[in-house]
């Protein structure tokens, strides 16, 4: 693990010591190199001795998320260049350092082998994100958004700490690799039901579960571009990852407790998709679509069959790349028009034809067009939920239809129609933006050729 962690730490002095005109290029190139090292972890042999130590271990669930995290840093840096072009030099360096610090915490969270260590790092990711949102956001509401973000996450995760101490007392260890072999199950007592709720609530808020999701649209809308990208792509996956790690420890309690949460997720999935159909704000629409996709992941994790786990991991990776790409596109619109309202940006297809092609591809991956891994993930989840209960197929079908509707609605409102006169003298799309879109789409397309490397713990 250190062969990723140490280079990531060294990116911070690299940023502060670079020449002013080389900051972006240095960090981006070295970030890409680190992400190429992390691809090594995707090859998981059966005797997984190479990748485990006392502090860190990686298995086939954390490896894809690790690769996604490291892949995102250079993309965030590429996307932020225009946003920070007017800032003084030290502030640029501070911004890049925050992103690197956040990536460091995330890498360590996904590979921590101890539950308390995992908890500390899970909370530590909050700090750089909060600074990025409240310092570099666009509107003044960003302070409000930061407050929501902080308090929702903290309120959710404090009971988890108490629950972990209790589990440590009960089982004698909190090491992931040791607890897997613990034979004695937790009985269905009232105290253990509260224990389950305490464990799950932190991750449900992070996912977010419908009803606990109010911080997400706020944080997404107010965050700068890199904040939105990392929030949608990786921070939401922390919730899914934590749930997949902890639900297996708490059986048979999970089977007993899962019903209300699954109902809430299935209901919330349709509700948030319907909210998307009425949005005027572009970033808000993408944020709500994230909530509905993550509701699918919650359902999959709570069903707890091999198929649903495969679907959940595939969907998490696919959604990470897709939503990040959509935020980049929304940001490139925002940099030209200085408004997030979709109607004001209509008719862009005639002015920026290549950008319209990227919009089309991003919308199609968002609505899970057949060859993409989004579809593979959704199919696995739909099949496993159908075998769990036949009625869910109706809800899933409605949700998939509404997803297709709002994705196409987003595409049509931003790209088609007659353009308004205030955007005639718009800047053309930069090579940087096209490269950014290519680097988002490339993994999606390549993974659809060989999806089994991201199907998680079963393979």
UniProtKB/Swiss-Prot annotation:
Its main location: mitochondrion. It comes from the Eukaryota. It catalyses: a ubiquinone + NADH + 5 H(+)(in) = a ubiquinol + NAD(+) + 4 H(+)(out). It is a multi-pass membrane protein. One of its GO terms (cellular component) is mitochondrial inner membrane. The chain crosses the membrane at residues 22-42, 60-80, 93-113, 114-134, 147-167, 193-213, 224-244, 256-276, 284-303, 308-330, 351-371, 391-411, 435-455. It is an enzyme of class 7 (translocase). The keyword Transmembrane applies. InterPro entries: NADH4_N, NADH_Q_OxRdtase_chainM/4, NADH_UbQ_OxRdtase, ND/Mrp_TM. One of its GO terms (molecular function) is ubiquinone binding. The keyword Electron transport applies. Keywords: Electron transport, Membrane, Mitochondrion, Mitochondrion inner membrane, NAD, Respiratory chain, Translocase, Transmembrane, Transmembrane helix, Transport, Ubiquinone. It is found in: Mitochondrion inner membrane. Belongs to the complex I subunit 4 family. Core subunit of respiratory chain NADH dehydrogenase (Complex I) which is composed of 45 different subunits. This is NADH-ubiquinone oxidoreductase chain 4. It comes from Canis lupus (Gray wolf).
